[in-house]
Amino acid sequence: VSQSQQPVVEMRDLTMQWGARPVLDRVSLVMQPGERLAVVGPSGAGKSTVLRLLAGLQLPTSGELRLFDRPQTYLRLDQTDPPDVRLVFQNPALLASLTVEQNVGFLLREQGQLTREEIRERVEACLEAVGLFDVAHQYPGELSGGMQKRVSFARALIDNPQRGDEAMPLLLYDEPTAGLDPVACTRIEDLIVKTTTVAKGCSVVVSHVRSTIERSAERVVMVYGGHFQWSGS
């Protein structure tokens, strides 16, 4: 079965416990290729825990988590070939001492498989895809907050050349529009949809902003009391 036909995410009876308290209690979820999902719920309900599990930053206490049909039994840093999961943080998390081009192309440079010119071309294409022009040689501190956020989206578009054409990333967005004014919110919401489409991936957005939930997702899951209380479009 090709990757494009397999579920991207499968959670089966998954439990995540802190001490004696289950944050997530025997939850199950399946995400198909191309799907855009929003995870909602009150503060402390476990929304961020869902993202951290999908990002490989934590392992479930029990139950099964599969990404791209591979069981996740090790933390991301302990895997030799981790799944293609890309996290866009609430704050852009850019390295201040590197230029925009160096930030966006960081992983490609570390892998050392492409020439500097090839990396530059890929970075330029990703920056243009998020509406940024002529900023490659600037530093994050020289950009507005909104532009920095766009740079973090461009970074999420960078593909690993080792992965084939069928590669389909899972993009995770943690409160991407928190603290933004309505106009900036709309731009970022459009960007979530565009970034996910351009990357040919699927996305999970954690948000409490109603417009973000409505505009950037086709399906919503509500986390409350350790359970996925309902799921719908």
What positions do the PLM features span?
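A short, surface-exposed alpha-helical micro-motif characterized by mixed small hydrophobic
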Residues: 213-215
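Catalytic Walker B motif of ABC-type/P-loop ATPase nucleotide-binding domains
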Residues: 166, 171-174
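Helix-to-loop junction immediately C-terminal to a conserved catalytic motif
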Residues: 55
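H-loop/switch region of ABC-family ATPase nucleotide-binding domains
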Residues: 207-208
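ABC ATPase NBD coupling module
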Residues: 72-86, 110, 116
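The feature captures the beta-strand-to-loop junction immediately N-terminal to the Walker
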Residues: 40-42
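Conserved ABC ATPase signature
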Residues: 139-143, 147
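Conserved ABC ATPase "signature" region
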Residues: 116-135
